[in-house]
């Protein structure tokens, strides 16, 4: 029973005293000696001391660790506040009294808060620095300098603001560079469109990221890319300038050849894309394909083709202009020698010593001068036409007056009667017409310092001959009238003495058609020659008839050419050989 209680000492309340009491009871039962008991008690005491000693050592060690932890926490707190630079924003206890654990408990919340801030600040620094490093690598051309390291000794907001300002500057620089790259790419695109070049291959040769399929933010903005883009743009602009210069030269040649060869508008429209830029500046040429090589080659082929046709076409155009010049002279009744002029034009073109443009320009100048001269002669020529028309009417009137049947009731007689009335009025103005024409002609000759010729004959000579013939006609009429009076005077006296006798029937002359002038003997004989021939053949009666039929101005023109002793010839409008 005692053994069982000894083996279960923990059944009751266990203390050192109860244990010692139990030990005494056991020794009493066993019969241990006092020496043995003292020895055992001493051993127990030593073992208790060792236990206490170990506990003290453990407690001391724990205290030291707590002190070290407190010290480390204090240092960490100091370092964090220094690194973050935000001591004023953290509730940090200043007192050093109280137990170690109390001090640790007081520091722990501030330390935890600073650790959180540090982690957030490190992430912010890491994010900013990574963006800065990325942009710097893009500007440097994609050089990777390795992962960035955040300096945790200085995590202050001031330093973070500095990094953020630097990031903003780099972002602005990146934006500016990207904008510049896009401008370069757009310029390259426009130039390639005008020159009809492959835009994609052109920009990808500079950098693969410049392909339009790639996003804007992925395009290279490095110094090398910008430099190569600038060089590409410069090369394309020089190419554009050279092509435009070549195209304008071809356009000028085409225009000259067209003007030279009088090319139709339909043929010219085929090369509007060439001539439309003949005076354009480089920046004004923006149409797609306007300076393509194939268009320039087409223009070159057309210029070569026109050059080959130029000689034959030149002769055709020159003769056409010569015909125009001859027509102007013909309308102005100016006599030239067209055969000689055409031969000289042919020889000049075949020799090739004269530029076609100069030749045609000279002919155009002659045409302009001919038109001016024709215009200056117009008033006189109009008066000449009126004079000739009046003379024709006078000739018709004389034929009409000699017609014995003019008052008959034949068909159209009333029309001839009206015409005769108008003709008499017109004939009465002929003298004034001639006088005015002479005055106008003399004034023209004084103004132009040259003789006024009509179909190669001086007009004043024609008018003088006409005036002379008209005066002879008037004199002849007066002479015949006086002669007739003298012949009729004896008959009048005889009739008054013995009475009148019926005269034999007057022979009826052959009926002549009225309205057509009859100049028996031909229109091309000179009045003086015709008068001379008629006088020799028919005597005074023929001479009288010739004077009554005054020569028309057209006959005077033809005959004055033959009879003029010193005709005034007009210089042929022939281009001077260079």
UniProtKB/Swiss-Prot annotation:
Residues covered by region (Disordered): 473-578
Species, as recorded: Arabidopsis thaliana
Pfam families in the record: MAP65_ASE1 (PF03999)
Protein name as annotated: 65-kDa microtubule-associated protein 2
GO biological process, alphabetically ordered: cell division; cytokinesis by cell plate formation; microtubule cytoskeleton organization; post-embryonic root development
Comp. bias regions, Polar residues: 549-558
Biased composition (Basic and acidic residues): 473-494
InterPro entries xref list: MAP65_Ase1_PRC1 (IPR007145)
Any coiled-coil regions, as ranges: 64-84, 151-184, 235-257, 290-312, 461-489
